Amino acid sequence: ETETADLNLDAARITLNKRYNLNLTNEQIIIMASIIEREALTDDDRPKVASVFYNRLYDDMYLQSDATLAYSLGREATAEDLSSMTSDPYNTYAFKGLTPTPICSPGYASIKAAMDPAATNYYYFWITSDEHVFSETYEEHQQAIENARERESASKQ
């Protein structure tokens, strides 16, 4: 039996579309999996990263994925790139919804996470050097960033 035996996209799509009031196609689930693949540090974090992006889609927010920008640019994005890439459909800071195509070939764990995200109220995450910090509100997110930067700064002294 292969790992893919339990990857029933059709069943997952029906569940996701009900849970998040979306009208996703199987291809869009794979697009989501590709974004998760590039954003998550560990397999354990993938369902939580998925929940962030699905929660944002549900609430008609921008995905704001750095990974989609990096895919389009072929390198890490800068703040300047954000303002100059306003017509790029891979700029999920400027375009709502998913990218037109996958941004990589997602692995099994990312596909599973895209099919069955964690049930959270997370809308934000920050990646430190070794972990994700998830937040429910923008204020919590800003505090998490500040805390992470303070820890990194203290560890360099």
Feature-to-residue mapping (PLM):
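Bacterial extracytoplasmic/cell-wall-associated proteins, especially those involved in peptidoglycan
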Residues: 1-157
